[in-house]
Amino acid sequence: MMDELDKDQIAMLKKAFDGFDHEKKGAINCDVVATILRMMGQAYNAQTLKELIDEVDADGSGMLEFEEFVTLAAKFIIDDDAEAMAKELKEAFRLYDKAGKGYIPTSALKDILKELDETLNAEDLDNIIGEIDTDGSGTVDFDEFMEMMTG
């Protein structure tokens, strides 16, 4: 999970972790984890929190070392990023689905792809469209569009 976060995110988590590791033991307890998660907008009851911590507490100490803490926090950061991306892609799709039918013609998608990469020739575009329009309908629905954009 740590490799899915950028340097700034890891630095922010390190700062939060160090700030709550008052005794400088290199580990924080469950209560502190709960406080940090609340600060991140994530509130859980005691049982759910225990399950989350048990999931990432590799050494079973009941305390989270920094790497374990990052694994836990990354779940929320990555989920938030994925949600934001899905929302942006839905907006982009809606711009091209002017009639609101829930799909865009592959011809419109070709235009979009050409704008994104001017080096694509007709054969490249046909190959890409063939991969995206999995049902061969000549249209691309939101799920196909989402798959193309997120790979």
Swiss-Prot record:
Domain EF-hand: 8-43, 44-79, 84-119, 120-151
Domain of life from the UniProt record: Eukaryota
Transmembrane segments: none
A GO molecular-function annotation: calcium ion binding
Pfam families per UniProt: EF-hand_7 (PF13499)
UniProt keyword terms in alphabetical order: Acetylation, Calcium, Metal-binding, Muscle protein, Repeat
InterPro entries cross-referenced by the UniProt entry: CALM/Myosin/TropC-like, EF-hand-dom_pair, EF_Hand_1_Ca_BS, EF_hand_dom
PROSITE patterns: EF_HAND_1 (PS00018), EF_HAND_2 (PS50222)
Gene Ontology CC entries for this record: myosin II complex
Positions with a binding annotation for Ca(2+) 2: D133, D135, S137, T139, E144
SMART domains: EFh
Binding site for Ca(2+) 1: D57, D59, S61, M63, E68
SUPFAM superfamilies: EF-hand (SSF47473)
Residues that bear N-acetylmethionine: M1
Entry similarity comment: Belongs to the troponin C family.
PANTHER family (UniProt xref): MYOSIN LIGHT CHAIN 1, 3 (PTHR23048), TROPONIN C-LIKE ISOFORM X1 (PTHR23048:SF46)
Function: Troponin is the central regulatory protein of striated muscle contraction. Tn consists of three components: Tn-I which is the inhibitor of actomyosin ATPase, Tn-T which contains the binding site for tropomyosin and Tn-C. The binding of calcium to Tn-C abolishes the inhibitory action of Tn on actin filaments.
Note: There are two different troponin C in barnacle. This protein binds two calcium ions.
Name of the protein in its database record: Troponin C, isoform 2
